Amino acid sequence: MMEYKKLGNICNIVSGGTPSRSKSQYWDNGNIPWIKIRDIKSKYIEDSEEFITIEGLNNSSAKLLTKGTVLYTIFATLGEVGILKIDACANQAIAGLTVKDETKILPEYLYYYLKSKKNIVNKLGRGVAQNNINLSMLKEFEIEVIDIVKQNNIIKTLNYVDDIIKFKSLELKQLDELVKARFVELFGDPATNEYNWPMLNLENVSSIITYGLTVRPTYVNKGIDLISARELHKGFIEYEVAPKISFNDFQSLSDKGKPLKNDILFSKTGSIGHCALVDTDKMFAITQNAARLGLIIEKVNPVWLLYYLRMNYIQDWCKRHAKGNAVKDLQLKDIKAIPLFECPLELQNQFADFVKEVDKSRFIIKSMIKEGLL
């Protein structure tokens, strides 16, 4: 019989904090690592972008977490997990989980267990206004408790799988670099336009540039996918993790918020510039933080435009033109004004054919990674 225990019973759980930014003495020449979500990039966390002083630690809700503490993101980006290899503090978007008795639960087992439940936690978080879970909710989360020998066997197996995934992920990254290199070879870099292409704006090759619904319908367990900027950050549309709305609510929405095949979706709020191609005829809707680019395919190849928009110069252009303080937003008028090469459609198609061939290799590698995860 499987035994489950609540996280609050097997771990000491605390949230982080942020010293006042207005007090330089809390930050200048600090030597205490201060972890943010973007610092959780892999299994082990060994460094941070920012540091705070001992005065900043003592005059804020930040807490010093010891090496071996499991970090878990509880705000905005939910369910990211890492293990501290150093003593550090964290901000309030991160919870620190310190195992009370490591003879019963290994931190590394806890890491893998929590990582496997990310989709469940994301669904739980979407039930609240700001996509977050609080410490009370986290403490109630149940974990399967097995004996230490089995925990070690699971850790050993998953470490091996992790190594394979890292290697295959590197291969994927190399394929991405190959595609970028081919783009520059055929069209040049948008930063310099060394081929002297005439320039257009994005609106010149678009039939519609708009965004999705502004009032969120009620979520349901099964229904029509509702895609936001959050589901675009990997470069493709993550339908499987998107919240769902009812078919009746979907039908009541304006058609502008219902993308069509060969449209490009573009994150316009928060993490600006993530984009993905709609390569299916399935029905779904988008939120207001995702822009829909409906294209005139007689003027532009969607695959070519997708990679053009991902070029560093265009990404930087979009970030420079974004408005707002706490949360940046790229307004529709600025999206329409994105500068665009006017290059032959035949050459764009040639590039798209190259991408199609590379995608065959991508598919094989991703399938191998998926098998490893399963």
Predicted ranges, named:
Residues L114-N122, R310-Q315, D359:
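Short amphipathic alpha-helical signal-transduction/dimerization elements
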Residues N31, N91-A93, G223, V241, ...:
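A generic structural signal for short beta-strands and their flanking turns/coil linkers
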